[in-house]
């Protein structure tokens, strides 16, 4: 659930991160496998694989799982036949939504994604309908209660980050997507543990909604993220100040 709110406001979606850890690992396995298939099994010479592995490590995915995913991608543990697709559309309140998927059955995935949009009061759009509103960025987030903003800022800028901002108790480090892996690795080596790390589609501007519409939009995003074929969901929703998702 990237590109629309800080970690502190999206814990309702993953927050339950432990309960959803298996599902999250499944998504990482797909991402690592397809990266290894396309560029080889060595993270040192395959930037996409290196990024995927770093993201998995940041989420505490076991090393054995990562190694098996790489071998699956290189064909050592069977063939990988995932297709990468991008769905674009609008959610409640006119929020722009991008859905990135890895699927072995695009008809199944298209039907599922369309159904979620429709039942949630949104609509799936044509290719290019909302993607122009976003830019791909590396986004690394830290809990401001756990790490020092000053220390993160110094280390991140030294590592080549584009921007560092703190809001609602979350320190957000933004990078060029090509620098994401090296910046994350540099911060990990200095002992900074992120709460989330991903190359995400970040919107140019955000759309403010009332609390009721925000709740509906976030519920739609939750449902999309729960689909096993969906890797990431990005939107331009701006969370109202003081908003809390009902349990």
Curated annotation (Swiss-Prot):
User: What family classification does the UniProt entry report for this protein?
Assistant: Belongs to the TACO1 family.
Q: Which HAMAP family match?
A: Transcrip_reg_TACO1
NCBIfam families the record matches? PRK00110.1, PRK12378.1, YebC/PmpR family DNA-binding transcriptional regulator
> What molecular functions are annotated in GO for this chain?
DNA binding
The keyword Cytoplasm belongs to this UniProt entry's keyword annotation: yes
* Biological process terms in GO annotation: regulation of DNA-templated transcription
A Pfam family matched in the record: Transcrip_reg
Source species:
Treponema denticola (strain ATCC 35405 / DSM 14222 / CIP 103919 / JCM 8153 / KCTC 15104)
Q: What keywords is this UniProt entry annotated with?
A: Cytoplasm, DNA-binding, Transcription, Transcription regulation
Task: Name the GO cellular-component terms.
Answer: cytosol
Q: Per its UniProt entry, which superkingdom is the organism in?
A: Bacteria
As for subcellular location, the record says: Cytoplasm
Q: Please report the name of this protein according to its UniProt entry.
A: Probable transcriptional regulatory protein TDE_1487
């Amino acid at each position: 659930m990237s590109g629309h709110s800080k970690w502190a406001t999206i814990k309702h979606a993953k927050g339950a991160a432990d309960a959803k850890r298996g599902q999250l690992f499944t998504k990482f396995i797909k991402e690592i496998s397809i990266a290894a298939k396309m560029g080889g099994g060595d993270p040192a010479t395959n930037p996409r694989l290196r990024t995927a592995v770093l993201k998995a490590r940041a989420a505490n995915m076991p090393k054995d799982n990562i190694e098996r995913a790489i071998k699956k991608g290189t064909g050592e543990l069977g063939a990988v036949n995932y297709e990468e697709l991008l769905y674009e559309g609008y959610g409640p309140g006119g929020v722009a939504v991008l859905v990135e998927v890895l699927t072995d059955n695009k008809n199944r995935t298209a039907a599922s994604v369309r159904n979620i949009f429709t039942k949630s009061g949104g609509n799936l759009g044509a290719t290019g309908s909302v993607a122009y509103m976003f830019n791909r960025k590396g986004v690394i987030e830290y809990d401001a209660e756990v790490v020092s903003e000053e220390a993160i800022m110094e280390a991140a800028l030294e590592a080549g980050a584009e921007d560092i901002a703190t809001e609602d108790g979350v320190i957000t480090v933004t990078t060029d997507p090509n620098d994401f892996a090296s910046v994350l690795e540099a911060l990990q080596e200095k002992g900074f543990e992120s709460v989330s790390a991903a190359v995400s589609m970040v919107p140019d501007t955000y759309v403010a909604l009332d609390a009721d519409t925000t709740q509906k939009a976030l519920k739609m995003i939750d449902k999309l993220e729960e689909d096993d074929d969906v890797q990431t969901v990005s939107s331009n929703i701006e969370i109202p100040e003081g908003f809390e998702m009902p349990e």
